[in-house]
Amino acid sequence: MKLSVMFIVALVLSLSMTDGLPRRAENGGRIFRQHSPDSMDPQTRQIKTRTLCPEHCTNGCNMDMTCI
């Protein structure tokens, strides 16, 4: 009886600790928090990132800022 209760408690605690990982992974594939505390929007929980590509590059850009 004691062993099963301890197992259930350990399972619940481990699930609650890993609950935030899938949500962070959905937001741009980033799991680790950015350095700035203001980098995540508290209402939408999405990470704010600035785009370095020019606006006319719809498919993204290379490192030298040329469109793909």
From Swiss-Prot:
Q: Tell whether Ribonucleoprotein is among the UniProt keywords.
A: no
Origin superkingdom: Eukaryota
Residues forming the propeptide are: 21-50
Q: In which tissues is it expressed?
A: Expressed by the venom duct.
Please report the PTM annotation for this entry.
Answer: Contains 2 disulfide bonds.
List GO molecular-function terms, semicolon-separated: toxin activity
Example of a GO cellular component annotation carried by this entry: extracellular region
Predominant location? secreted
**Cell location:** Secreted
Q: Where would one find the signal peptide in this protein?
A: 1-20
Q: Which UniProt keywords apply?
A: Disulfide bond, Secreted, Signal, Toxin
Family, similarity comment? Belongs to the conotoxin L superfamily.
User: Which comment does the entry carry about domains?
Assistant: The cysteine framework is C-C.
Q: From the Swiss-Prot or TrEMBL record, give the protein name.
A: Conotoxin ba14a
Species of the source: Conus bayani
